[in-house]
């Protein structure tokens, strides 16, 4: 948390615990960072520990250690097959992934997320049609709207107890999604988070939490199983 505070102060903000809005701000282009350098893979980084812009011809990429933020639209494509990215490793220093960062990366199959990731922005991985199952870190607090929309090959999702919010339609149209597990009590769920997940069979929730989950996700009440 101390390193995160220092990063925020470097961006001109002073905060105790960053909010969802703070993380969105970190990832935005409101602060037009000066490009500090381009790495050997052709990826641009700022002088404020942000990955600014990626090379869409890369097939595999490891985000550099020390990076705090993957900026909005960093690897986003304007057409589904414009990106060649197949696998992605997010350094454990990264705390936030911005809006549309990897959206429509149609060949992307494998991602390893930072163990310290807190925020995933809206549409971050939407339309990554070939993305396979992956693990969310125990640090994660915010998953933005449509963040994994139309990730057709996901079959199982396990959400950490740290999670505070899932935005609307975050996992909508994940056609092969069958099993979801919540390790803790999710305070807020947007509308339609599993909309059009026609193969969803069961949502595992903690014992004693059924009333809460029916309240925040009433349309899925027949799928809840306490354990």
Feature locations, PLM:
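Structural signature of tandem-repeat unit edges
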Residues: 1-44, 54-69, 80-96, 106-119, ...
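Consensus positions within tandem repeat domains that build extended binding/scaffold surfaces
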Residues: 51-52, 73-74, 98-101, 121-124, ...
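Short regulatory "switch" loops immediately downstream of catalytic or recognition motifs
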Residues: 75-79
């Amino acid at each position: 948390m101390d390193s995160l505070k220092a990063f925020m102060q470097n961006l001109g903000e002073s905060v105790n615990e960053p909010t969802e809005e703070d993380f969105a701000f970190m990832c935005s282009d409101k602060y037009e960072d000066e490009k500090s350098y381009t790495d050997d893979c052709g990826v641009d980084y700022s002088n404020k520990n942000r990955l600014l812009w990626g090379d869409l011809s890369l097939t595999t990429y490891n985000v550099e250690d020390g990076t705090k933020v993957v900026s909005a639209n960093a690897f986003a494509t304007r057409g589904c097959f414009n990106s060649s990215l197949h696998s992605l490793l997010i350094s454990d220093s990264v705390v936030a992934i911005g809006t549309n960062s990897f959206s429509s990366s149609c060949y992307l199959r494998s991602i390893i997320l930072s163990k310290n990731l807190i925020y995933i922005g809206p549409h971050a991985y939407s339309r990554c049609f070939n993305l396979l199952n992956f693990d969310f870190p125990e640090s994660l607090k915010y998953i933005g709207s449509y963040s994994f929309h139309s990730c057709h090959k996901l079959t199982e999702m396990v959400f950490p107890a740290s999670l505070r919010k899932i935005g609307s339609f975050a996992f909508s149209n994940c056609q092969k999604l069958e099993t979801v597990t919540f390790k803790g009590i999710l305070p807020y769920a947007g509308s339609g988070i599993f909309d059009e997940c026609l193969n969803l069979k069961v949502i595992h929730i903690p014992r004693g939490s059924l009333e809460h989950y029916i309240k925040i996700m009433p349309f899925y009440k027949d799928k809840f199983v306490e354990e």
